[in-house]
């Protein structure tokens, strides 16, 4: 069969790297069809092309083999051999060495390499060669399709080049295939015409033609059917976008130099895509807008020729595009353009049409007035007609012929220009105004006056119309406007107003305008004119004082001024103005431009100001101080005693003066009660407001009705009241930055002088950054205290005065406790004055802003007072800090003299991160203190704080004694307390703080450098935010963190006084709580909290989240600290000192307690978890010796390193002891750790004791040095891993005592052991077994273990107690382990102990049901003692006394019964002792070997009850009675046990019951015996017989007659003992000694028939070889023969089973006394010499 094309292609590549032609493949398919693969390899390898490919073939002996290997790897797989990840060094070395093995390997190497790669599964290599072969065949097919079937050398080389690029990737194959397609397509090329003329075109061909022909013939079949289409010539003319797209869609490629141009609409061009982007150049055929032109210009091949039609806005917005256009057409000629835009359009220098409209500001139009932009506009529109024009500008605009017909204008110019302008210009204006800079126009004409008066700002200018002009001579004139100026005559200056002038006003508002300056000769400052009816005086003083004197009579030259209402004084260059005795009350006074401290003084005839509601309006404008000189304004009646009750004060009247400060002294305006202030200039009242002033209003409120509605004063106001007496002040300041201070006391008496009717001042700073100070006191018989309102702005408020009254306290930013009225801004509020009253305390609202609030003694300020709140019924400041980050500090104390009432400050932080510090104490009078009225109290003076004096201080009876007392106390002589308080102040008050939103810091306690300790019983709420709350004073506090991650720190308190018992509640968030000293209550709240109680008896409540209690046990006693964990909460609790739970502690969630003391600690949870549905705890010990008692629930206890004592108490516990020697009980442990009455029903525990010599009990562990009354409850189902070390492990109850163990104390008389699982690990001989002082490795008991030590200490039971063992599983370890299934009882050596089991019952029979422990015991390695049910050992000086006395006592005065369970016991490796039921041992000898009979001394419970040699007949009869009695009192029923010896020389004691005993089969896989060579099965006396009543037959498996043996007990009342003959003096016994036994072996019975055990005994009788009746010699001194017989049952129900019968030495065969055992898997047969298999020993078990 011919090789496939793929194989041929692959071989060609492997040896030549070349392709194969179609003709090559045809040869291999025909002529070479019979060539095998091996032959083909040889042909290719020996070809010339292979020698060319691999130069190695030409000189293989001298060539480089490594190079050859490299070439082959590269040729086949494109792999570089230097890449060790692809070609391991080992492989490379292999192939180089392989080439040297044989010359034939040279040529075969490419083939061998590929075969080896395939065998190794190197798929990447195989894939690479496969890809190369596929590409080679693709090349062959492509050329064959084009008609090329035989390759030229060039085509072979071309194929090789393509193949060489291929590797194992798909990408390399695709790239090669693309090259092949391109090569194939180039083989046949036609023009369209040629292709149309060719009848049979090849399957693959190319069309190559001009672009124009391709566009025309795009749909021709010869074009669409071509493999490739080439445009070989550019189009003759520009193409449309459509044609260009046809060209690109048709032509697969363009020949070199072929390009095309585009000429089409702009829309088609911009949407043309590749047709446009690929063009050589692009042109358009239409007009475009600016955006389109911009897009076209973005094309890199656009020819740049375009015309634009668009809006003026778009054209102007893009000058770059617009400037390049050949023409511009405006699409919105009706939309106006700016001057700049019109200038741009005119500057383009290209046709622009149609014309446009200009709209712009007057300034821009005027600037371009004669330019083409304005001249060529169709219309010009001014768009800011509200902007004034000068006269010249208005004329220029009006001269434009294309000005918009609706043009309006306003004019602003100087008076000269306005006067010179055509009247039509002013008449046509909407309005006009003057621009003169000097407001004083001087003397003008009436025409000018008309123009001035027509101006919108006429009121800003002063001018005089020359109606009446005074002369230096006497003028007696009448008129409306009088002008008096200084004139020059003859070179001298004369004032024109003099004493001889008589001026009479006429018309409306007659006015005298007066300019006064120093005269050249005989300057006069005081004149006496007669002014009648002149209502307004405008006086300007120029460096000259003026006094106008009015007498009260009308005489020329004597002065008389009447009718004057308004005075305007101006002192630009200085001068005092004084008007004396005016005969008419003034209405307004204006003082302006007083810069040099000149004064103004007016007096008015007394009758004119005799009323009680006179009003004066005073205006000050630009009245400034000049150094120490301040302008003083004095206005009063002529006598100087009366004046205006109401004063309206305006500071500044024009906006140009805003920012100046008017500084005036208005103290001379007498009798003023109310002052209303408005204006815009700053105002400083340089002297105190007088005592009559009680109202100041700068807000226009209704406080002063006459000024209600006036504008709020916006300047900065400075004013103060000194300490002159007066009424309560209400001061409402304006919106500036004000400085107001009040030193006046609020102390107003009633008309009868009996009552204080004052309440306190009210000071409102209004808006602005104000400094508000009240140093005066406030006294009242009702409600005493000042009110200060900062208003908006950053205010500084200081209150140093005392507030004293029944209700006493200053109020800041409110009028009461409820209604906040201001306080925005960052305020600084300082109150040092005390509040004294029945109810006393200041109230502060901080409002918005970052406020600093201080109440207390401030040593940085020279002020008095301590900021204390001193009350009878209630005392304490109230602070509402408000929004933002505030600071509140209170150093003043709160005190109530009535101990039953409240004392303490209250602070609300509001939003923001606040700092709140209170160092003031919260005090009340001690209940035992005595209040005594001060006999020297002066009720006409303000009272001071009540005076505390010592309890033994006598009350002064004389003024002298009183002054001495004050001096002793360091108080001033005028100290005026209302009462003496004899006693001490008590810390029983409470400050209350609420932090509000924000991260607040709240501190109670001393502040550095401040008075007070912060003592008291405080309450704080952190609210939202991460708050820090701390108490460092003395007292007990309650802190609530609120939302956020808070830190709460309680105080240390004073244990002597009982303080420091804090309540801390973290609320929401992750909080830290520290109680400090005292008995604290800590509750974490929501979130993950950390709580530390500090010293004292603390209570922790974990109500949610994951909380950490850091210092449980740091208390006054072990039960001091307690905690509770809520449902769904988790607590990590660090126990720092010994700790004991009480009923307060419970866990409904997850609680983990960790002992922190490395030296060890104690945790006792026994009293915890009183509520229902509680959960257990996790307790983790430290490296020291820990004592841990669990709860009644399911606990997890980890003792850690150290010698720990652990009791799980109730519940299903998990206990781990870790390293070292531990005492562990799954439930109760008495070391003594736990009172006996606390022992509870036990849980199902999981205990891992870890390494160390541990003592472990699943339920109860007692180790005590005293007598103990033991109370047994039912045991739990425990799992115990004892771990490494010598461990004492008991499944249920373990008791060790240096005293008596009284089992009578059990409340329940039946105790049921749990089904326990116990495992242990390698011990270290660390246990001294209590009998014989034998060192053992581990001691395991399934249910009950009890041991007593000490002289005379006993285990006794006189009341009936039933112990039912559990079904336990116990596994030992290597070493000597003692494992007991149910009960182990021991008394120590030489201590004369008794184990009294009177009325003790092991197991229970209830009807047909037997309850006993069915245990599974595995000894593992080592020589083990394994007992299924009971192990009792007692050592005493008296020996064994059964009936009374010391020793092991059974059944005295009661009934003792043992019921064994059906146990499974496996010895494992080692020489083990296996007992199925009960073992009573008197002595174990050290070193102990369970196979050495000398190491055992077993107890015979019957020994002392049998007759002895030499007994009389009566004694023998009594012995029989005693024995019979014991058999009634002591009953034992063994279980059906399974005993498996395992390896080693094991000893078996099946005991009572039908036991199954596997003594080993001694066979391994290798045929070597692995079980013991000498294994022993024990059989005791009649009551331990294996065939009691024919039903108790043991089954022994694996008996090897060569090695194993039966050991029988010999001696009195035991098997092989013979029979006691009544009346004989000597009881006959077998004369058999250990090691000298002689047995008589009968022939086996091989075909017995038996349906039951009795049938087996009958088989012995029936087939006995001696006769029907066995007879033995029983004479004393002679050895006896004991018959043995093997019985094989061949029929009946027991068919197939084998038995061994042994007679007990009495001739008759008896199922009651003789021995029968079933043998299974017996190895060998018994020989005549039976010594190796049978032995008699003296022992009792």
From Swiss-Prot:
Q: Where is the composition biased (Polar residues)?
A: 894-904
Phenotype on disruption: The deletion mutant has similar pigmentation, but a more flat, spread morphology and a shiny surface. It displays a smooth lipopolysaccharide surface as its most peripheral layer. Viability of the mutant is reduced upon exposure to lysozyme treatment and hypo-osmotic stress.
**Manganese: present as a keyword of the record?**
no
Reported modifications of this chain: Glycosylated.
Q: What is its main location?
A: secreted
What is said about the domains? Contains GGXGXDXUX nonapeptide motifs, which are found in members of the repeat in toxin (RTX) protein family, and which are implicated in Ca(2+) binding. Binds Ca(2+) and shows Ca(2+)-induced reversible conformational changes.
Q: What is this protein called?
A: S-layer protein
């Amino acid at each position: 069969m011919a090789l496939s094309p793929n194989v041929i292609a692959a071989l060609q590549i492997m040896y030549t790297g070349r392709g194969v032609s179609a003709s090559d493949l045809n040869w291999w398919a025909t002529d070479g069809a019979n060539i095998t693969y091996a032959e083909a390899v040889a042909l290719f390898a020996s070809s010339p092309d292979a020698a060319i490919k691999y130069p190695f073939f030409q000189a293989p002996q001298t060539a480089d083999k490594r190079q050859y290997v490299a070439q082959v790897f590269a040729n086949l797989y494109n792999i570089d051999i230097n890449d060790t990840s692809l070609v391991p060094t080992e492989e490379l070395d292999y192939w180089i060495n392989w080439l040297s093995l044989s010359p034939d390997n040279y040529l075969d190497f490419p083939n061998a390499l590929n075969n080896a790669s395939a065998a190794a599964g190197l798929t990447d290599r195989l894939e690479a060669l496969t890809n190369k072969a596929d590409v080679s065949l693709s090349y062959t097919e492509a050329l064959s399709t084009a008609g090329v079937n035989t390759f030229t050398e060039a085509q072979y080389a071309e194929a090789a080049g393509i193949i060489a690029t291929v590797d194992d990737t798909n990408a390399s194959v695709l790239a090669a295939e693309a090259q092949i397609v391109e090569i194939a397509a180039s083989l046949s090329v036609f023009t369209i015409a040629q292709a149309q003329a060719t009848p049979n075109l090849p399957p693959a061909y190319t069309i190559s033609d001009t672009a124009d022909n391709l566009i025309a013939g795009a749909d021709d079949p010869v074009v669409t059917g071509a493999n490739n289409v080439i445009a070989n010539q550019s189009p003759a003319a520009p193409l449309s976008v459509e044609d260009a797209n046809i060209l690109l869609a048709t032509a697969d490629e363009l020949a070199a130099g072929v390009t095309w141009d585009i000429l089409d609409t702009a829309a088609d061009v911009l949407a043309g895509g590749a047709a446009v982007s690929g063009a050589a150049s692009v042109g358009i055929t239409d007009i475009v807008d600016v955006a389109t032109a911009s897009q076209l210009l973005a094309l890199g091949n656009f020819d740049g020729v375009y015309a634009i039609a668009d809006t003026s806005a778009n054209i102007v917005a893009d000058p770059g595009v617009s400037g390049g256009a050949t023409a511009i057409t405006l699409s919105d000629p009706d939309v106006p353009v700016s001057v700049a835009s019109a200038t741009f359009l005119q500057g383009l220098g290209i046709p622009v049409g149609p014309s446009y409209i200009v709209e712009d500001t007057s300034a821009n139009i005027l600037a371009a007035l004669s330019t083409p932009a304005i001249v060529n506009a169709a219309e010009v529109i001014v768009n800011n007609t509200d902007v004034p024009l000068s006269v010249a500008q208005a004329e220029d605009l009006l001269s434009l012929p294309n000005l918009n017909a609706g043009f309006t204008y306003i004019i602003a110019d100087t008076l000269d220009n306005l006067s010179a302008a055509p009247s039509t210009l002013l008449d046509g204006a909407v309005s006009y105004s003057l621009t003169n800079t000097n407001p004083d126009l001087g003397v003008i004409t009436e025409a000018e006056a008309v123009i001035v008066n027509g101006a919108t700002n006429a009121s800003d200018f002063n001018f005089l119309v020359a109606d009446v002009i005074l002369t230096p001579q006497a003028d007696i004139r009448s008129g409306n406007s009088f002008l008096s100026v200084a004139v020059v005559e003859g070179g001298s200056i004369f004032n024109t107003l003099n004493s001889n002038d008589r001026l009479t006003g006429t018309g409306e508002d007659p006015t005298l305008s007066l300019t006064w300056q120093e005269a050249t000769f005989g300057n006069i400052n005081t004149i006496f004119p007669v002014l009648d009816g002149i209502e307004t005086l405008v006086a300007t003083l120029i460096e000259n004082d003026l006094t106008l004197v009015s007498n009260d009579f009308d005489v020329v030259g004597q002065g008389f001024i009447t009718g004057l209402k308004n005075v305007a004084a101006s002192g630009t260059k200085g001068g005092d103005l004084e008007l004396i005795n005016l005969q008419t009350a003034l209405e307004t006074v204006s003082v302006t431009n007083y810069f040099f401290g000149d004064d103004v003084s007016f007096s008015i005839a007394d009758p004119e100001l005799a009323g009680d509601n006179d009003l004066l309006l005073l205006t000050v404008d630009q009245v400034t101080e000049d150094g120490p000189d301040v302008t003083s304004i004095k206005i009063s009646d002529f006598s100087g005693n009366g004046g205006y009750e109401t004063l309206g004060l305006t500071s500044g009247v024009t906006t140009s003066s805003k920012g100046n400060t008017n500084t005036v002294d208005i103290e001379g305006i007498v009798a003023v009660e109310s002052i209303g202030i408005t204006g815009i200039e700053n105002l400083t009242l340089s002297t105190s407001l007088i005592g009559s002033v009680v109202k100041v209003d700068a807000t226009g409120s209704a406080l002063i009705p006459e000024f209600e509605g006036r504008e709020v004063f916006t300047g900065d106001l400075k004013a103060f009241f000194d300490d002159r007496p007066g009424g309560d002040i209400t001061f409402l300041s304006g919106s500036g930055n004000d400085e107001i201070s009040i030193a006046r006391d609020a102390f107003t008496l009633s008309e009868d002088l009996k009552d204080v009717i004052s309440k306190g001042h009210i000071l409102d700073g209004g808006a602005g950054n104000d400094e508000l100070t009240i140093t005066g006191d406030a006294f009242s018989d009702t409600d005493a205290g000042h009110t200060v309102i900062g208003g908006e702005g950053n205010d500084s408020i200081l209150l140093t005065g005392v507030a004293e009254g029944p209700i006493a306290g200053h109020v800041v930013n409110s009028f009461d406790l409820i209604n906040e009225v201001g306080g925005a801004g960052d305020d600084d509020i300082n109150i040092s004055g005390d509040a004294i009253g029945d109810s006393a305390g200041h109230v502060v609202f901080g409002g918005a802003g970052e406020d600093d609030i201080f109440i207390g003694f401030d040593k940085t300020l020279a002020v008095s007072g301590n900021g204390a709140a001193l009350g009878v019924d209630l005392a304490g400041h109230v602070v509402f800090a408000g929004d933002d980050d505030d600071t509140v500090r209170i150093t003043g104390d709160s005190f109530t003299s009535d101990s039953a009432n409240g004392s303490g400050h209250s602070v609300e932080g509001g939003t923001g991160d606040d700092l709140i510090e209170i160092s003031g104490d919260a005090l009340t009078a001690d209940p035992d203190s005595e209040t005594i009225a001060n006999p020297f109290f002066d009720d006409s003076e303000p009272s001071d704080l009540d005076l505390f004096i010592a309890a033994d201080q006598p009350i002064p009876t004389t003024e002298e004694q009183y002054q001495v007392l004050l001096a002793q106390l360091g108080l001033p002589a005028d100290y005026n307390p209302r009462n003496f308080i004899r006693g001490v102040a008590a810390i029983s008050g409470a400050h209350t703080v609420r932090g509000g939103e924000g991260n607040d810091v709240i501190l109670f306690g001393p502040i550095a450098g401040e008075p007070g300790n912060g003592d008291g019983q405080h309450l704080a709420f952190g609210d939202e935010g991460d708050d820090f709350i701390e108490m460092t004073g003395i007292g007990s506090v309650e802190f609530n963190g609120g939302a956020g991650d808070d830190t709460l720190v309680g105080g240390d308190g004073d244990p002597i006084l009982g303080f420091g018992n804090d309540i801390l509640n973290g609320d929401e968030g992750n909080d830290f709580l520290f109680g400090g000293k005292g008995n604290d209550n800590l509750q974490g709240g929501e979130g993950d909290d950390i709580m530390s109680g500090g010293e004292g008896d603390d209570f922790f409540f974990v109500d949610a989240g994951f909380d950490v209690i850091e210092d449980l046990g740091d208390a006054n006693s072990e039960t001091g600290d307690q905690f509770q964990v809520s449902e769904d909460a988790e607590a990590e609790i660090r126990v720092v000192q010994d700790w004991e739970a009480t009923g307060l502690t419970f866990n409904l969630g997850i609680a983990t307690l960790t002992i922190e003391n490395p030296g060890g600690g104690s945790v006792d949870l026994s009293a915890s978890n009183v509520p229902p549905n509680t959960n257990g705890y996790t307790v983790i010990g430290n490296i020291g010796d820990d004592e841990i008692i669990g709860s009644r629930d399911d606990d997890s206890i980890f003792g850690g390193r150290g010698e720990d004592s652990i009791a799980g108490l109730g519940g299903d516990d998990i206990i781990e002891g870790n390293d070292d020697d531990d005492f562990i009980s799954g439930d109760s442990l008495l070391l003594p750790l736990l009172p006996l009455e606390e022992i509870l029903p036990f849980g199902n525990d999981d205990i891992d004791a870890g390494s160390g010599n541990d003592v472990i009990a699943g339920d109860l562990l007692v180790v005590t040095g005293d007598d103990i009354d033991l109370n047994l409850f039912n045991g739990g189902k425990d799992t115990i891993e004892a771990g490494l070390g010598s461990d004492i492990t008991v499944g249920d109850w373990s008791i060790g005592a240096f005293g008596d163990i009284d089992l009578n104390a059990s409340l329940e008389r039946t105790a049921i052991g749990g089904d326990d699982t116990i495992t242990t690990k390698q011990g270290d001989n660390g246990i001294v077994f209590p009998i014989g002082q034998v060192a053992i490795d581990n001691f395991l008991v399934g249910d009950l273990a009890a041991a007593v030590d000490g002289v005379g200490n006993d285990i006794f039971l006189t009341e009936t107690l039933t112990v039912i063992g559990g079904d336990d599983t116990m596994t030992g370890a290597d070493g000597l382990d003692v494992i007991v299934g149910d009960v182990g009882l021991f008394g120590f050596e030489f201590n004369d102990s008794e184990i009294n089991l009177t009325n003790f019952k092991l197991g229970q029979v209830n009807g047909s049901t037997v309850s006993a422990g069915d245990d599974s015991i595995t000894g593992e390695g080592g020589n083990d003692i394994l007992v299924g049910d009971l192990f009792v050992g007692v050592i005493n000086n008296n020996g064994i006394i059964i009936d009374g006395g010391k020793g092991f006592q059974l059944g005295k005065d009661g009934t003792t019964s043992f019921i064994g369970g059906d146990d499974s016991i496996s010895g494992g490796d080692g020489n083990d002792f296996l007992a199925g039921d009960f073992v009573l041992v008197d002595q174990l000898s050290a070193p102990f070997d369970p196979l050495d009979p000398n190491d055992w001394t077993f107890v015979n419970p019957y020994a002392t009850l049998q007759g002895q040699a030499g007994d009389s007949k009566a004694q023998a009869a009594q012995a029989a009675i005693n024995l019979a009695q014991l058999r009634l009192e002591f009953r034992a029923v063994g279980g059906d046990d399974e005993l498996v010896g395992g390896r080693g020389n094991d000893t078996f004691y099946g005991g009572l019951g039908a036991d199954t005993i596997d003594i080993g089969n001694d066979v391994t896989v290798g045929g070597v015996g692995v079980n013991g060579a000498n294994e022993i099965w024990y059989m005791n006396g009649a009551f331990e017989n294996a065939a009691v009543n024919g039903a108790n037959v043991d089954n022994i498996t694996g008996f090897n007659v060569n090695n194993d043996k039966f050991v029988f007990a010999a001696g009195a009342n035991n098997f092989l003992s013979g029979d006691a003959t009544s009346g004989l003096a000597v009881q006959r016994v077998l004369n058999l000694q250990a090691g000298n036994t002689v047995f008589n072996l009968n022939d086996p019975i091989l075909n017995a028939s038996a349906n039951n055990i009795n049938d087996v005994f009958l088989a012995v009788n029936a087939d006995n070889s001696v006769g029907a009746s066995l007879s033995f010699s029983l004479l004393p001194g002679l050895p006896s023969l004991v018959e043995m017989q093997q019985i094989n049952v061949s029929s009946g129900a027991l068919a197939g089973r084998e038995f061994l019968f042994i007679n007990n030495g009495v001739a008759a065969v008896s199922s009651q006394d003789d021995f029968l055992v079933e043998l299974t898997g017996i190895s060998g047969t018994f020989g005549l010499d039976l010594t190796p298999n049978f032995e008699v020993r003296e022992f009792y078990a």
